[in-house]
Every structure is written in C-alpha cells, then in structure tokens.
Regions:
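Serine-esterase "nucleophile elbow" of acetyl-processing enzymes
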Residues: 1-48, 54, 73
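Short acidic/His/Gly/Ser-rich catalytic and metal-binding motifs that mark active-site loops
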Residues: 14, 52-55, 135-140
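N-terminal start-of-chain detector that recognizes signal peptides
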Residues: 15-17, 53-58, 98-102
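Short, flexible/disordered intra-domain loops and linkers
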Residues: 16-25, 57-61, 141-146
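Alpha-helical cap/lid subdomain in secreted, periplasmic
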Residues: 39, 64-158
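A general secondary-structure junction signal
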Residues: 47-50, 128-130
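Charged, often glycine-rich, active-site loop that binds/positions anionic groups
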Residues: 51-70
Length: 158
C-alpha cells in the first residue's frame, strides 16, 4: 500500500464556501484522488482551515502555521511514499505576497525532503500544488477574509 499525505488548508479540508460546513469525503479532491488511485493507495488528508505556509496568524498565533505542524504530521503518518502540499492562499489574508507564500512552500518542501529520512526508509516524493485561483466575487463578499488586493495577488500563483 502506498501512503500519500495531502497537507493543505480549507481546500484540502473540504470547506464549503459561505460557512456551510464540509463537503463529504467523496466530493473533496482528496476523496476523488483516492477513488481514482484505487485500493493500492491510501490518501491521508491533513487539511486545516486557515493554514498558512510558515506565517503565524496575528489572531491565532502558530496554531495555523503549516511549518509548526508539518514535521509532526510527517512523523505520525510515516512511512510515506509521497507528500502533496497545497498551501499559500491564507498567506495572502495577512498581507503577504504570492512570492512570500512561494518561499514558504520552499521551506516546507525542504522540511519534507530533509526531515523525512529520520523516520522513513526513503525520502517521499513531493508534489507541490499551486493554490487554486480565488474568484473575484469571493474576495468582494463581506464573509471573505481575502481582500481585493489579496485576490489580485492570488492571480500570481501558477
């Protein structure tokens, strides 16, 4: 069995926009990946609403900082064959740029590639996924913590 850790934010968690709860597992992208890959693979979903790459929240401190929790996730789910990281959108909510978010992803990537050997027989493969583009209409709603300037910055992701 191949183990794949998916480390991300609300898009990995399955957040339904507008605060309407969580998508069923089969609807989330991790569930779709599990279905497509089949029984020889186990998708490990590590999504957290509001998670950033490496930045503390001015309101919640390090609770949502992806760097603070990645190593524990790598260790608790070992051995891993692959790690998928999809983070960066929430960095923009705290006035960081797409470039800074990409640097944060590089830091996380190095943690996977360098730290995994401590508890894995081999270094897992790494897939770094660009955050999804946020719709302009979402940035303009009162419920969105992403400003219009954050929306424009998000377009700089691949």
């Amino acid at each position: 069995m191949k183990n794949i850790l998916c480390y991300g934010d609300s898009n990995t968690w399955g957040y339904i926009p507008g605060g309407k709860g969580r998508y069923e597992y089969a609807v989330r992208w991790t569930g779709a990946a599990q279905r497509l890959l089949g029984d020889g693979y186990r998708i490990i979903e590590e999504g957290l609403n509001g998670r950033t790459t490496v930045f503390d929240s001015p309101f919640d401190g390090s609770v949502l900082n992806g760097k603070s929790h990645l190593m524990c996730c790598l260790m608790s789910h070992a051995p891993l064959d692959a790690v998928v990281i999809m983070l960066g959108t929430n960095d923009l909510m705290h006035s960081h740029t797409a470039w800074e978010a990409s640097r944060g992803c590089i830091t996380l990537s190095r943690m996977v590639m360098n730290g995994a050997l401590h508890f894995n027989a081999h270094t897992p493969r790494l897939l770094l996924v660009s955050p999804i583009h946020i719709g302009h209409e979402i940035a303009e709603t009162d419920q969105s913590p992403l400003s219009v300037s954050g929306y424009e910055e998000s377009l700089k992701f691949a």
